[in-house]
């Protein structure tokens, strides 16, 4: 199977089942604790090996300049780090909203690093890829390692956990929230004590939520609407909100009644990232 020159790979969504901010470091980064779960839904990336050194990114790039695109940055980083002479053509089918808090850009970057590590035969370990990925964003390492986990520190210290499978209806209220704006805002809660004891009692708490609701009333409106069905929560710094169910039918019922001004999808949680599952099926 070592002669594979093209394949496609999912870049899955993530949800933060809780997000606590414990403090702000001198370098501006925040100490946090958050529980990540992956979903079996996401962007789709197609990779085609090229003998020319160029990295070409096509598809749903939303007008982002190539040099600012995290997919391009990830490919260039690995190519430069490992002195690769080959190039690649990458096509993106975008399903995850930008500025939604479901990890779209970070997931795209991680899946690119994982895929090209195979395609270019660079043979880096997951730890080495995660170290590279951290240069692209604090959430990239969790997508590289690809396991449900509690993240500590600035998000780079991962404690693997096993979560029961759940179904989610995730709603994007067509509002883009800037992560940088939230984390630099003076009103952000930054003093939550670190978890001691059972982390499961902290499920569905998010220190960013009250501030985002204040700055983006549509998020509060979304959370209130979802409350008709189940306890609702915001993921990351928003703007996506979600509700959790035991069955697909329950999640589908929410999606079927979604106001036409919003977008949404349903998906089940998985303890191993679909990107890892698909790569194993292709290369192992």
Swiss-Prot record:
SUPFAM superfamilies found in the cross-reference section: GHMP Kinase, C-terminal domain (SSF55060), Ribosomal protein S5 domain 2-like (SSF54211)
UniProt record, GO biological process: isopentenyl diphosphate biosynthetic process, methylerythritol 4-phosphate pathway; terpenoid biosynthetic process
Catalytic machinery residues: 14, 139
Top-level enzyme category: transferase
Entry EC number(s): 2.7.1.148
Pathway terms, separated by semicolons: Isoprenoid biosynthesis; isopentenyl diphosphate biosynthesis via DXP pathway; isopentenyl diphosphate from 1-deoxy-D-xylulose 5-phosphate: step 3/6
Gene3D superfamilies assigned: 3.30.230.10, GHMP kinase, C-terminal domain
GO molecular function term, any single one: 4-(cytidine 5'-diphospho)-2-C-methyl-D-erythritol kinase activity
Family: Belongs to the GHMP kinase family. IspE subfamily.
Role played: Catalyzes the phosphorylation of the position 2 hydroxy group of 4-diphosphocytidyl-2C-methyl-D-erythritol.
NCBIfam families: ispE
Descriptive protein name: 4-diphosphocytidyl-2-C-methyl-D-erythritol kinase
Species assigned in the record: Pseudoalteromonas translucida (strain TAC 125)
Annotated gene: ispE
């Amino acid at each position: 199977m070592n002669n594979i020159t093209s394949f496609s790979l999912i870049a899955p969504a993530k949800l933060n089942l809780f997000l606590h901010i414990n403090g702000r470091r001198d370098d501006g980064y925040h100490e946090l604790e958050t529980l990540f779960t992956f979903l079996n839904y996401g962007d789709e990336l197609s990779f085609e090996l090229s003998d020319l050194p160029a990295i070409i990114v096509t598809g749903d790039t939303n007008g982002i300049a190539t040099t600012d695109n995290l997919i391009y940055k990830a490919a260039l980083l690995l190519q430069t780090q490992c002195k690769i002479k080959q190039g690649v053509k990458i096509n993106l089918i975008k399903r995850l909203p930008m500025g939604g808090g479901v990890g779209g850009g970070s997931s795209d970057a991680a899946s690119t690093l994982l895929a090209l590590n195979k395609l270019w035969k660079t043979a880096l370990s997951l730890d080495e890829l995660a170290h590279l990925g951290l240069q692209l964003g604090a959430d990239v390492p969790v997508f590289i390692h690809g396991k449900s986990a509690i993240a500590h520190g600035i998000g780079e210290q991962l404690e693997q956990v096993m979560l029961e499978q759940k179904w989610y209806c995730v709603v994007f209220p067509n509002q883009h929230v800037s992560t940088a704006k939230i984390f630099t805002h003076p009103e952000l809660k930054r003093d939550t004590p670190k978890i001691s004891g059972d982390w499961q009692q902290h499920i569905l708490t998010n220190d960013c939520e009250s501030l985002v609701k204040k700055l983006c009333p549509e998020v509060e409106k979304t959370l209130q609407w979802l409350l008709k069905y189940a306890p609702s929560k915001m993921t990351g710094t928003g703007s996506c909100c979600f509700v959790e169910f035991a069955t697909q039918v329950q999640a589908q019922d929410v999606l079927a009644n979604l106001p036409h001004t919003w977008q949404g999808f349903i998906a089940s949680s998985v303890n191993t990232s679909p990107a890892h599952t698909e790569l194993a099926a292709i290369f192992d």
